[in-house]
Design a protein with these regions (language model features):
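Fe-S-dependent hydro-lyases/dehydratases of central metabolism
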Residues: 1-196
């Protein structure tokens, strides 16, 4: 997802790490340039503020939304809605299958209007971990895990074929197959990135 076109608080900064330059949105610079007191915000609101600074465009993210985060310091509440854009979305199969079906339906609708259906893709990276359809059919044997996964693939072959199609059809979309682990474990051990 591309950053916004505005930089109202001159927070866009650059850091050099071992000769490689990286851009980031500095809360310290934003505080010096009009967002007084934001260093006192709770960490959770600092994450939201950095996200708003990154995507400020005067359309979906406005200066008013950014200032609402700062104003939270006064009353410890806000009625302003903000447009949070996560860098990545983690789904498990029960929420992911309907999402893929929605994307497929949107592509079909775009195609019916004689437009390019390939333009329909997730804006943020999506990782879908298939972990909620495993059932225990065999236990207490050395090959129980392998047998349960084999049965799982037979039982849900149509669903898995659909998800495999989705992974091939859409950009920014990865599938983690069943038998790999639960979504939170897989996320922490394999998928999550420290920086974007």
């Amino acid at each position: 997802m591309k950053p916004g076109t505005k930089n109202s608080y001159n927070s866009l900064s650059e850091i050099d790490i071992q000769g490689k330059k990286f851009k980031y949105y500095s809360l310290e610079n934003a505080e010096k340039n009009g967002l007084d007191g934001i260093s006192r915000l709770p960490k959770s609101l600092k994450v939201l503020l950095e996200n708003l600074l990154r995507y400020e465009d005067d359309l979906s993210v406005t200066k008013k939304q950014i200032e609402a985060i700062k104003e939270w310091l006064k009353d410890k509440k806000s009625k302003t809605e903000i447009a949070y854009r996560p860098a990545r979305v983690l789904l498990q199969d029960y929420t992911g299958i309907p999402a893929v079906a929605d994307l497929a339906a949107m592509r079909e609708a775009v195609k019916n209007k004689k437009k390019d259906p390939e333009k329909i893709n997730p804006l943020s990276a999506v990782d879908l971990v298939i972990d909620h359809s495993v059932q225990v059919d065999q236990s207490a044997k050395s090959d129980s895990f392998e047998k349960n996964v084999e049965i799982e693939f037979k039982r849900n072959s149509e669903r898995y074929s659909f998800l495999k199609w989705g992974q091939q059809a859409f950009d920014n979309f990865r599938i983690v197959p069943p038998g790999t682990g639960i979504c939170h474990q897989v996320n922490l051990e394999y998928l999550s990135k420290l920086t974007w």
